Structure formats: C-alpha cells, structure tokens
Amino acid sequence: MTQSSVDIHAISERVQQESLVVDRIFQEMDRVIVGQRYMVERLLIGLFCDGHILLEGVPGLAKTLTVSTLAKIVDASFKRIQFTPDLLPADLTGTTIYNQHQGDFIPKKGPVFANLILADEINRAPAKVQSALLECMQERQVTIGDETYHLEDPFLVMATQN
C-alpha cells in the first residue's frame, strides 16, 4: 500500500466517525425541536465552521429553545441576552466592582463569557451595544478595566431579530 491510500483510508474513517456524532446531535435535537431541521442544520454549520449566525423569523419559531437545546447537547455553556433599548455595553462584557474588604476593584464578567450566546432581538439594541458585541465576535476577547480576557472556545453568537 502506498502512503496516500493509507491517508485516504484514515480520512474516510474519520469522516464516518464524525458523521455519527452529527447524526446523534440531530437525533437529540429531533426529540425537542419539531419541524425546524433546516434551522438546526444551519446552526450546526455555524458551530462546526466557528462562525456566527443571524436567525430571522417571526416570534414562536422556537429559536431560543433550539439554541439552548443545542448547547445542552454539545455540553457547552449557554447565555441568553435579551437586547433592549436601555442595554449598556457593560451589561454584555462586564465591569469592575469595588471590593471594600480588599480595597481593590475586581472584575465581574458579563454574559459573553460563555460558549454559545443567544443575542435575542439584537435589532432593538443601541449601536454602542451592538458594537461591543461585534468586537467580542471579531476579536474573541474582552477588556474589563485594564485586563484583557480571552473568550471561551468555541465562542458562537447566534443573534435573533424579528
């Protein structure tokens, strides 16, 4: 056997193993989410490609339930952020809090420090908040005070808008 045929065989086995994992994810999702196979496929593509996703649709399509279910299935941390006109950038990223006992400021990390983030109704947020989220998505890090923190891997933002 040549070296290239061994590599092809190994690749073929790896693809078969990975497809079993994907099939298992679909089976688990189908137990909770009915009639949204297209959306589930797109969420998995985003997850596997390390990209971010914008989910558009009318209320009641189970967008939130789908994302939270996916997070449970892949054993990832999950946070849902409800975007409102009065939301501040620090509400996403976090801030420093004064600790009277230590006489020092300590960081309080925001909800972007999770693997899967559901940015619900992102179109309702002010531009500064959207900008803060876009920075997290692009740089995959957050600065709180003087410290920079790397976001967890995988880091996937799934934003919804109605």
How would you describe each model-predicted region?
Residues E56, S77-P89, I144-D153:
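Short beta-strand-centered segment that lines the nucleotide-binding/catalytic pocket of NTP-utilizing
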